[in-house]
A protein has these predicted regions:
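A domain-level signal for the structural core that forms small-molecule/cofactor-binding pockets
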Residues: 2-247
Length: 247
């Protein structure tokens, strides 16, 4: 009997399953394509799409679980660490590093109707950050001196923008410069001075273990830079505020 089967059966192409790219990789590829930097102290909130921060939190929690297991910590039987990964992911994305992933708080400026041009200082403002080398805390205080221009912002807004800027991995020198840039953008003062005094736990908690050591740095711009007497007045006002708080 003659066979009626075809001499050859065409093969069927099977497309292999490919898992979706991790959300962190998709975000990085988008930033690279746009030429946007994502250094430790950069803010990337404008480049995150709806729902991506929640997806990133899930991914980070998974990576923290891997880290804990690599440190030979039993996260399955120890009730103290069962939910540590989720807590750490939440903490990084929404608290200690929120200045990277969340937009700047809404800060309105107002016309300087009275044409005020005398300097004033705001502080001490508590600042909390993390050393970008070891991701351990930087804790300290900040003072801001302003010689108003045509626009002014409320006193509490200085605290809000300082918290937003410092809530990222930093080195202190860069943090102060970024804060100065943001304040200048918000109210365009005639003069701006910022002083930060902070303790670095990369020196206090590890390494040389110097518990009393602190770092002090400042930035002066505009009239504070051009007029030495204004600069001296700012530092004197800071000293008076410190003395008042210590009594």
């Amino acid at each position: 009997m003659t066979s009626t089967l075809p001499s050859s059966i065409p093969s069927r192409t099977i497309t292999p399953y490919s898992a979706p790219l991790p959300i962190s990789l998709r975000i990085r590829e988008r930033l690279d394509a746009a030429g946007v930097a994502y250094l430790a102290n950069d803010n990337i909130a404008d480049h995150l799409r709806d729902g991506e921060l929640e997806q990133l939190e899930i991914e980070v929690a998974g990576k923290v679980r891997e880290l804990l297991r690599s440190l030979v910590i039993d996260i399955d039987k120890d009730h103290n660490t069962e939910e540590t990964a989720e807590r750490v992911a939440r903490m990084y994305l929404h608290e200690v590093f929120k200045g990277r992933y969340h937009e700047q708080p809404k800060i309105a400026s107002f016309p300087n109707v009275k044409k005020l041009d005398e300097i004033y200082t705001v502080g001490p403002i508590s600042v909390r950050s993390a050393c970008s080398h070891h991701l351990v805390p930087i804790l300290g205080n900040c003072w801001i001196g302003i010689k108003p221009g045509d626009r002014v912002i409320g006193l509490s807004k200085f605290s809000r923008v300082a918290d937003w800027v410092f809530s990222r991995p930093h080195i202190q020198e860069e943090a102060v410069m970024i804060l100065a840039d943001e304040i200048e953008r918000l109210c365009e003062p005639q003069g701006l001075a910022i002083l930060v005094k902070a303790q670095h736990y990369c020196m206090k908690w590890r390494g040389v273990k110097e518990p009393q050591t602190s770092m002090v740095n400042s930035v002066v711009r505009g009239d504070f830079r051009l007029d030495p007497s204004l600069k001296a007045e700012f530092f004197e006002l800071v000293k008076q505020q410190e003395c008042m708080l210590s009594t």
